[in-house]
Protein backbone atom coordinates (compact mmCIF):
# COMPACT_ATOMS: atom_id res chain seq x y z
CA UNK A 1 0.00 0.00 0.00
CA UNK A 2 1.24 3.47 -0.80
CA UNK A 3 2.45 5.57 2.11
CA UNK A 4 -0.04 7.95 3.79
CA UNK A 5 2.17 10.86 2.81
CA UNK A 6 1.98 10.05 -0.92
CA UNK A 7 -1.76 9.50 -0.78
CA UNK A 8 -2.23 12.72 1.13
CA UNK A 9 -0.76 14.78 -1.67
CA UNK A 10 -3.70 13.75 -3.84
CA UNK A 11 -6.18 14.91 -1.23
CA UNK A 12 -5.05 18.48 -0.72
CA UNK A 13 -2.12 20.83 -0.88
CA UNK A 14 -1.11 21.38 2.71
CA UNK A 15 1.16 24.08 4.04
CA UNK A 16 3.50 22.70 6.74
CA UNK A 17 3.09 25.97 8.60
CA UNK A 18 -0.62 25.27 9.11
CA UNK A 19 0.08 21.87 10.63
CA UNK A 20 2.44 23.17 13.30
CA UNK A 21 1.82 21.96 16.84
CA UNK A 22 0.12 24.71 18.80
CA UNK A 23 0.18 23.05 22.20
CA UNK A 24 2.28 25.87 23.64
CA UNK A 25 -0.76 28.12 23.77
CA UNK A 26 -1.69 28.90 27.36
CA UNK A 27 -4.60 31.17 28.21
CA UNK A 28 -4.76 32.84 31.59
CA UNK A 29 -7.73 33.66 33.75
CA UNK A 30 -9.04 37.22 33.36
CA UNK A 31 -8.58 37.55 37.12
CA UNK A 32 -4.79 37.22 36.81
CA UNK A 33 -3.16 40.38 38.25
CA UNK A 34 -1.58 42.67 35.70
CA UNK A 35 0.57 45.74 36.17
CA UNK A 36 -0.30 48.81 34.11
CA UNK A 37 3.16 50.12 33.21
CA UNK A 38 1.61 52.79 31.01
CA UNK A 39 0.84 54.78 34.14
CA UNK A 40 4.19 53.98 35.75
CA UNK A 41 6.42 54.85 32.80
CA UNK A 42 5.03 57.73 30.79
CA UNK A 43 8.22 58.01 28.72
CA UNK A 44 7.57 54.69 26.98
CA UNK A 45 4.30 53.61 25.47
CA UNK A 46 3.07 50.51 27.24
CA UNK A 47 1.73 47.47 25.36
CA UNK A 48 -1.00 47.19 27.97
CA UNK A 49 -2.88 50.14 26.50
CA UNK A 50 -4.06 49.89 22.90
CA UNK A 51 -6.01 53.11 22.72
CA UNK A 52 -4.88 55.75 20.22
CA UNK A 53 -2.03 56.83 19.94
CA UNK A 54 -0.48 53.86 21.71
CA UNK A 55 -2.08 51.47 19.22
CA UNK A 56 -0.42 53.23 16.30
CA UNK A 57 2.94 52.91 18.00
CA UNK A 58 2.40 49.18 18.49
CA UNK A 59 1.42 48.67 14.84
CA UNK A 60 4.58 50.47 13.73
CA UNK A 61 7.13 49.12 16.20
CA UNK A 62 5.55 46.08 17.83
CA UNK A 63 5.60 45.25 21.54
CA UNK A 64 8.79 45.24 23.62
CA UNK A 65 9.40 41.62 24.58
CA UNK A 66 9.93 42.41 28.25
CA UNK A 67 6.46 43.90 28.50
CA UNK A 68 3.07 42.30 28.27
CA UNK A 69 1.18 39.36 29.70
CA UNK A 70 1.17 36.72 26.97
CA UNK A 71 -2.07 34.76 26.82
CA UNK A 72 -1.04 32.54 23.93
CA UNK A 73 1.03 32.28 20.79
CA UNK A 74 0.97 30.36 17.55
CA UNK A 75 1.98 30.42 13.92
CA UNK A 76 -0.09 33.51 13.18
CA UNK A 77 0.80 35.77 16.09
CA UNK A 78 0.82 36.37 19.83
CA UNK A 79 -2.14 37.18 22.07
CA UNK A 80 -1.61 39.61 24.94
CA UNK A 81 -3.72 40.85 27.79
CA UNK A 82 -4.30 44.55 27.18
CA UNK A 83 -6.43 47.56 28.06
CA UNK A 84 -8.86 49.06 25.56
CA UNK A 85 -11.18 51.92 26.48
CA UNK A 86 -10.59 51.17 30.15
CA UNK A 87 -11.42 47.46 29.94
CA UNK A 88 -9.20 44.38 29.95
CA UNK A 89 -9.18 42.68 26.56
CA UNK A 90 -7.25 40.10 24.56
CA UNK A 91 -5.15 41.60 21.76
CA UNK A 92 -3.69 39.44 18.98
CA UNK A 93 -0.66 40.98 17.27
CA UNK A 94 0.26 39.54 13.86
CA UNK A 95 2.61 40.28 11.00
CA UNK A 96 0.40 41.76 8.31
CA UNK A 97 2.29 40.29 5.35
CA UNK A 98 1.92 36.72 6.63
CA UNK A 99 -1.67 37.00 7.81
CA UNK A 100 -3.69 38.81 5.15
CA UNK A 101 -5.96 35.79 4.61
CA UNK A 102 -6.41 35.29 8.35
CA UNK A 103 -7.33 38.94 8.84
CA UNK A 104 -9.89 38.78 6.06
CA UNK A 105 -11.42 35.67 7.61
CA UNK A 106 -11.49 37.20 11.09
CA UNK A 107 -13.49 40.10 9.66
CA UNK A 108 -16.28 37.61 8.95
CA UNK A 109 -16.85 37.41 12.71
CA UNK A 110 -16.51 41.10 13.50
CA UNK A 111 -20.27 41.67 13.33
CA UNK A 112 -21.33 38.43 15.03
CA UNK A 113 -22.95 39.07 18.41
CA UNK A 114 -23.91 35.95 20.34
CA UNK A 115 -23.44 34.89 23.95
CA UNK A 116 -21.45 31.83 22.82
CA UNK A 117 -19.12 33.68 20.43
CA UNK A 118 -16.10 35.71 21.55
CA UNK A 119 -16.81 39.32 20.66
CA UNK A 120 -14.38 41.03 18.29
CA UNK A 121 -14.08 44.67 19.32
CA UNK A 122 -11.69 46.00 16.69
CA UNK A 123 -9.53 44.90 13.77
CA UNK A 124 -6.81 47.27 12.63
CA UNK A 125 -4.42 46.45 9.82
CA UNK A 126 -1.07 48.23 9.62
CA UNK A 127 1.65 48.07 7.01
CA UNK A 128 3.89 45.98 9.26
CA UNK A 129 1.72 44.62 12.07
CA UNK A 130 -1.99 44.11 12.55
CA UNK A 131 -4.10 43.95 15.68
CA UNK A 132 -7.29 42.08 16.58
CA UNK A 133 -8.88 43.21 19.84
CA UNK A 134 -11.28 40.74 21.44
CA UNK A 135 -13.36 40.11 24.52
CA UNK A 136 -11.19 38.58 27.27
CA UNK A 137 -12.28 35.12 28.38
CA UNK A 138 -10.83 32.33 30.47
CA UNK A 139 -9.00 29.15 29.55
CA UNK A 140 -9.73 26.90 26.59
CA UNK A 141 -11.89 23.80 26.63
CA UNK A 142 -8.71 21.88 25.79
CA UNK A 143 -7.14 23.13 29.04
CA UNK A 144 -10.16 21.87 30.97
CA UNK A 145 -9.99 18.47 29.30
CA UNK A 146 -6.28 18.22 30.10
CA UNK A 147 -6.86 18.63 33.83
CA UNK A 148 -10.34 17.57 34.92
CA UNK A 149 -13.05 15.14 33.76
CA UNK A 150 -16.25 16.96 32.87
CA UNK A 151 -19.55 15.91 34.51
CA UNK A 152 -22.00 14.63 31.92
CA UNK A 153 -24.43 17.50 32.48
CA UNK A 154 -21.64 20.00 31.80
CA UNK A 155 -20.58 18.11 28.67
CA UNK A 156 -24.00 18.40 27.06
CA UNK A 157 -24.38 22.06 28.07
CA UNK A 158 -21.03 22.91 26.51
CA UNK A 159 -22.01 21.02 23.37
CA UNK A 160 -25.31 22.90 23.25
CA UNK A 161 -23.63 26.28 23.63
CA UNK A 162 -21.15 25.66 20.82
CA UNK A 163 -23.90 24.23 18.59
CA UNK A 164 -25.97 27.39 19.17
CA UNK A 165 -22.93 29.49 18.25
CA UNK A 166 -22.46 27.55 15.01
CA UNK A 167 -26.15 27.79 14.19
CA UNK A 168 -25.93 31.57 14.60
CA UNK A 169 -22.82 31.70 12.38
CA UNK A 170 -24.43 29.59 9.66
CA UNK A 171 -27.58 31.71 9.68
CA UNK A 172 -25.32 34.74 9.24
CA UNK A 173 -23.61 33.07 6.26
CA UNK A 174 -20.35 32.17 8.04
CA UNK A 175 -18.69 28.73 8.34
CA UNK A 176 -16.13 28.61 11.15
CA UNK A 177 -14.06 25.81 9.54
CA UNK A 178 -11.79 25.15 12.54
CA UNK A 179 -13.94 23.92 15.42
CA UNK A 180 -11.81 22.25 18.10
CA UNK A 181 -11.36 22.47 21.90
CA UNK A 182 -8.51 24.98 21.58
CA UNK A 183 -10.88 27.35 19.77
CA UNK A 184 -13.54 27.16 22.47
CA UNK A 185 -12.95 29.42 25.47
CA UNK A 186 -14.68 28.98 28.81
CA UNK A 187 -15.97 32.14 30.47
CA UNK A 188 -15.83 32.68 34.22
CA UNK A 189 -19.49 31.63 34.49
CA UNK A 190 -18.85 28.37 32.62
CA UNK A 191 -20.25 29.40 29.24
CA UNK A 192 -18.41 28.12 26.13
CA UNK A 193 -17.44 30.77 23.60
CA UNK A 194 -16.35 30.02 20.06
CA UNK A 195 -13.27 31.95 18.96
CA UNK A 196 -10.58 32.17 16.24
CA UNK A 197 -12.34 32.69 12.91
CA UNK A 198 -9.05 32.81 11.00
CA UNK A 199 -10.08 29.86 8.81
CA UNK A 200 -13.71 30.90 8.32
CA UNK A 201 -15.39 31.19 4.93
CA UNK A 202 -18.58 32.80 3.68
CA UNK A 203 -21.43 30.59 2.48
CA UNK A 204 -22.15 31.08 -1.21
CA UNK A 205 -18.85 32.76 -2.06
CA UNK A 206 -16.01 31.01 -3.93
CA UNK A 207 -12.78 30.31 -2.10
CA UNK A 208 -10.22 33.01 -2.81
CA UNK A 209 -7.23 31.03 -1.55
CA UNK A 210 -6.06 27.43 -1.58
CA UNK A 211 -5.03 27.45 2.08
CA UNK A 212 -5.73 24.46 4.29
CA UNK A 213 -8.86 24.97 6.42
CA UNK A 214 -8.95 23.50 9.90
CA UNK A 215 -6.85 21.14 12.00
CA UNK A 216 -6.05 17.49 11.12
CA UNK A 217 -8.21 15.20 13.21
CA UNK A 218 -11.14 17.63 13.21
CA UNK A 219 -11.49 18.40 9.49
CA UNK A 220 -14.35 16.81 7.57
CA UNK A 221 -13.32 14.29 4.87
CA UNK A 222 -14.86 16.29 2.01
CA UNK A 223 -12.75 19.31 3.02
CA UNK A 224 -9.63 17.12 3.09
CA UNK A 225 -10.43 16.18 -0.50
CA UNK A 226 -10.39 19.82 -1.58
CA UNK A 227 -14.01 20.89 -1.18
CA UNK A 228 -15.03 24.17 0.41
CA UNK A 229 -16.03 23.99 4.11
CA UNK A 230 -19.80 24.02 4.65
CA UNK A 231 -22.07 24.07 7.73
CA UNK A 232 -22.01 20.26 7.56
CA UNK A 233 -18.22 20.39 7.91
CA UNK A 234 -18.61 22.38 11.14
CA UNK A 235 -21.05 19.75 12.43
CA UNK A 236 -18.48 17.04 11.66
CA UNK A 237 -15.78 18.90 13.61
CA UNK A 238 -18.14 19.43 16.54
CA UNK A 239 -18.85 15.69 16.54
CA UNK A 240 -15.14 15.07 17.12
CA UNK A 241 -15.22 17.61 19.96
CA UNK A 242 -18.26 15.85 21.45
CA UNK A 243 -16.32 12.57 21.44
CA UNK A 244 -13.26 14.27 22.94
CA UNK A 245 -15.22 15.73 25.86
CA UNK A 246 -15.98 12.25 27.22
CA UNK A 247 -12.82 10.46 26.05
CA UNK A 248 -10.44 13.30 27.02
CA UNK A 249 -8.19 12.06 24.21
CA UNK A 250 -6.80 13.86 21.20
CA UNK A 251 -8.12 12.33 17.95
CA UNK A 252 -5.52 10.00 16.38
CA UNK A 253 -2.98 10.90 19.08
CA UNK A 254 0.62 10.12 18.18
CA UNK A 255 0.10 9.88 14.42
CA UNK A 256 1.72 12.19 11.89
CA UNK A 257 -0.62 14.83 10.51
CA UNK A 258 -0.37 13.32 7.01
CA UNK A 259 -1.48 9.93 8.36
CA UNK A 260 -4.37 11.58 10.23
CA UNK A 261 -5.53 13.27 7.04
CA UNK A 262 -5.32 10.01 5.10
CA UNK A 263 -7.27 8.04 7.72
CA UNK A 264 -9.95 10.71 8.20
CA UNK A 265 -10.53 11.06 4.47
CA UNK A 266 -10.93 7.28 4.15
CA UNK A 267 -13.60 7.15 6.87
CA UNK A 268 -11.65 6.21 9.99
CA UNK A 269 -12.76 7.80 13.28
CA UNK A 270 -11.33 7.86 16.82
CA UNK A 271 -11.89 4.71 18.88
CA UNK A 272 -15.05 5.00 20.97
CA UNK A 273 -16.70 1.57 21.31
CA UNK A 274 -15.69 0.95 24.93
CA UNK A 275 -16.77 4.34 26.33
CA UNK A 276 -19.75 4.92 28.59
CA UNK A 277 -21.33 8.21 27.58
CA UNK A 278 -23.54 8.45 30.67
CA UNK A 279 -26.69 8.70 28.56
CA UNK A 280 -27.30 5.04 27.69
CA UNK A 281 -25.64 5.46 24.31
CA UNK A 282 -27.79 8.38 23.08
CA UNK A 283 -24.91 10.87 23.30
CA UNK A 284 -22.57 8.46 21.53
CA UNK A 285 -25.13 7.88 18.76
CA UNK A 286 -25.40 11.65 18.31
CA UNK A 287 -21.70 12.33 17.77
CA UNK A 288 -21.38 9.29 15.50
CA UNK A 289 -24.08 10.80 13.29
CA UNK A 290 -22.32 14.17 13.40
CA UNK A 291 -19.08 12.69 12.09
CA UNK A 292 -20.73 10.66 9.32
CA UNK A 293 -18.66 10.31 6.16
CA UNK A 294 -21.46 11.59 3.93
CA UNK A 295 -22.65 15.14 4.57
CA UNK A 296 -26.32 14.24 4.02
CA UNK A 297 -26.16 11.79 6.94
CA UNK A 298 -25.07 14.48 9.40
CA UNK A 299 -27.76 16.22 11.47
CA UNK A 300 -28.33 19.95 11.10
CA UNK A 301 -27.57 22.18 14.09
CA UNK A 302 -31.23 22.42 15.10
CA UNK A 303 -31.46 18.61 15.20
CA UNK A 304 -28.34 18.46 17.35
CA UNK A 305 -29.83 21.02 19.75
CA UNK A 306 -33.11 19.10 19.99
CA UNK A 307 -31.28 15.89 20.88
CA UNK A 308 -29.14 17.67 23.47
CA UNK A 309 -32.23 19.21 25.05
CA UNK A 310 -33.68 15.74 25.60
CA UNK A 311 -30.45 14.72 27.33
CA UNK A 312 -30.44 17.84 29.52
CA UNK A 313 -34.04 17.13 30.53
CA UNK A 314 -33.14 13.65 31.80
Predicted regions and their residues:
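Conserved catalytic-loop aspartate of Hanks-type protein kinases
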Residues: 234
Amino acid sequence: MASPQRLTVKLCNISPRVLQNTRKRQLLSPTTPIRNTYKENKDRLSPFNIDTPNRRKILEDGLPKKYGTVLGSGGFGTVYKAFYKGNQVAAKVMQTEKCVDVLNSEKHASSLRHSNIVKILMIEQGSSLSLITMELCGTTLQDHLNTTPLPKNKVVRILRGVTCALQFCHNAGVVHADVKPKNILMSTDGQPKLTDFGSSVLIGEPLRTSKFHGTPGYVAPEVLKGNKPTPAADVYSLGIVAWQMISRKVPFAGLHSHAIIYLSAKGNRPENDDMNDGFEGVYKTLYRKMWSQDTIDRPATDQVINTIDTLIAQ
